[in-house]
């Protein structure tokens, strides 16, 4: 096609689609007895782009990463926790393979595999869920189980979780139905005692009951604005059977429950087998042996445990693992701060003894990887405050004494400052 303003007879030309004359548009492209303007070309491109967006979920499903690929991607961002990564990779792959095949295979209905993550604070539960969502390019939202109450009580309804997921994808129901929901602090909604209580437990067992249908799969009616304040609005129908739910919690004390079960029958008195200190299992080793009966004793109701068939346990991070977290992942904390300082034209160096000191401090605080950022932020706060007002600083060096609070980071100046100090 060629760009023409007039035909051979000098006649004024018009766009065959919108009817605008050649003087009202920038370009008029001619074909055999037909013309199209640049504005209509742009409009056609927009229409095509929208259609591509609509079919993109199907394209994504056909290119579902394998469990090995999922595991390798997790390795780039999450240090350690190898058993949990393997469990997650298989569970996530099977979930999206199930969606791709329409919940059935050769007439056999495929069950839903929601996931329960058990591990101490700062061990990487949330990071694993976030990283999976980024890899699969699906909507992701987080909810805090401690804020949830069953319907009719002051607090957040469980349906609001789906409303948050819809917000993340501009209320596109099809996208939301392929999303991932991470519910944190799930251990905090455990039943307050082993026996059913006479008084209503609206934030414990009541929330577990409210979450049952949502996690298993139901058609949730969600208003675009959320909550119960806009009853006149048309509700969106969301099929939660296609949403992957990942629940996580520290489950403090669960190791003792597991230990009691394992040691039952070992006997007491003269015939008992006395275990030495070296034979005692660590918390991580005990958690890896968790059984449904242990979770029931901890306070989760059997029906709720049944909706979370895939269980992955995470161990407490060691000092070496924390040092690796500081420097090895793609978005490692030290790399983030180095990128931040580079925006000021300054190089930032963390010495090895500084990384060890940061890890030791985090271990002492018992906050896992979550506490690393606050330690680094505290050590660099004054420097980040002063640096934009300073000239000729080329490099900032952080050593062990900086982390201990005994000295400020070392500032290395460039040539102009060196000359000035020499004079």
Curated annotation (Swiss-Prot):
Chaperone keyword on record: yes
Q: Which InterPro entries match?
A: AAA+_ATPase, ATP-dep_Clp_protease_ClpX, ATPase_AAA_core, Clp_ATPase_C, Clp_protease_ATP-bd_su_ClpX, ClpX_bact, P-loop_NTPase, Znf_CppX_C4
Q: Give the Pfam families listed for this entry.
A: AAA_2, ClpB_D2-small, zf-C4_ClpX
Q: What is one cellular component GO term in this UniProt entry?
A: HslUV protease complex
PROSITE patterns membership: CLPX_ZB
List each copy of the ClpX-type ZB domain by range.
2-56
- Could you give a single Gene Ontology term from the biological process aspect? proteolysis involved in protein catabolic process
Can you tell me which residues bind ATP?
Answer: 120-127
Record-listed Zn(2+) binding positions:
15, 18, 37, 40
GO terms, molecular function: ATP binding; ATP hydrolysis activity; ATP-dependent protein folding chaperone; protein dimerization activity; unfolded protein binding; zinc ion binding
User: Which keywords fit this entry according to its UniProt record?
Assistant: ATP-binding, Chaperone, Metal-binding, Nucleotide-binding, Zinc
Source domain of life is Bacteria
* Binding partners and assembly: Component of the ClpX-ClpP complex. Forms a hexameric ring that, in the presence of ATP, binds to fourteen ClpP subunits assembled into a disk-like structure with a central cavity, resembling the structure of eukaryotic proteasomes.
> Which NCBIfam families does the record cross-reference, listed alphabetically?
clpX, PRK05342.1
Protein function: ATP-dependent specificity component of the Clp protease. It directs the protease to specific substrates. Can perform chaperone functions in the absence of ClpP.
Q: Which family does the record assign?
A: Belongs to the ClpX chaperone family.
Instruction: Indicate what this protein is called per its UniProt record.
Output: ATP-dependent Clp protease ATP-binding subunit ClpX
| UniProt lineage | Bacteria, Pseudomonadati, Pseudomonadota, Gammaproteobacteria, Enterobacterales
């Amino acid at each position: 096609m060629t760009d023409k303003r007039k035909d051979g007879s000098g006649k004024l030309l018009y766009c065959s689609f919108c009817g605008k004359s050649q003087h009202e548009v920038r370009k008029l492209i001619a074909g055999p007895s037909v013309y199209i303007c640049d504005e209509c070309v742009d409009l056609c491109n927009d229409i095509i782009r929208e259609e591509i967006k609509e079919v993109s979920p199907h394209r994504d499903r056909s290119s579902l990463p394998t469990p090995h690929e999922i595991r390798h991607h997790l390795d780039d961002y999450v240090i350690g926790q190898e058993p949990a990564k393997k469990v997650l990779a298989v569970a996530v792959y099977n979930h999206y393979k199930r969606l791709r095949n329409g919940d059935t295979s050769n007439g056999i209905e495929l069950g839903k595999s929601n996931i329960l993550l058990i591990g101490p604070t700062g061990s990487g539960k949330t990071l694993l869920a976030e990283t999976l969502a980024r890899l699969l390019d699906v909507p992701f939202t987080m909810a805090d189980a401690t804020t949830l109450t069953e319907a009719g009580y002051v607090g957040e309804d469980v349906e609001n979780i789906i409303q948050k997921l819809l917000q993340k994808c501009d209320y596109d129901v099809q996208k939301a139905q392929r999303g991932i929901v991470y519910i944190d602090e799930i251990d905090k909604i455990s039943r307050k005692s082993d026996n059913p209580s006479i008084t209503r437990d609206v934030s414990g067992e009541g929330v577990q009951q409210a979450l049952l249908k949502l996690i298993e799969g139901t058609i949730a009616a969600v208003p675009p604005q959320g909550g119960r304040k806009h009853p006149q609005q048309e509700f969106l129908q969301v099929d939660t059977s296609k949403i992957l739910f990942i629940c996580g919690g520290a489950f403090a004390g669960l190791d003792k429950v597991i230990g009691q079960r394992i040691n039952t029958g070992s006997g007491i008195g003269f015939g008992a087998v006395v275990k030495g200190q070296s034979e005692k299992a660590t918390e991580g080793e005990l958690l890896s042996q968790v059984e449904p009966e242990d979770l029931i004793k901890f306070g989760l109701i059997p029906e709720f445990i049944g909706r979370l068939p895939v269980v992955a346990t995470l161990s407490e991070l060691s000092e070496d693992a924390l040092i690796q977290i500081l420097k090895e992942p793609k978005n490692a904390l030290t790399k983030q701060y180095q990128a931040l300082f580079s925006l000021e034209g300054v190089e930032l160096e963390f010495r090895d003894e500084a990384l060890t000191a940061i890890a030791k401090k985090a271990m002492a605080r018992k906050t896992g990887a979550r506490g690393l950022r606050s330690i680094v932020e505290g050590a660099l706060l004054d420097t980040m405050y002063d640096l934009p007002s300073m000239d000729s600083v080329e490099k900032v060096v952080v050593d062990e004494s900086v982390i201990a609070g005994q000295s400020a980071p070392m500032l290395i100046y460039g040539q102009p400052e060196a000359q000035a100090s020499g004079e």
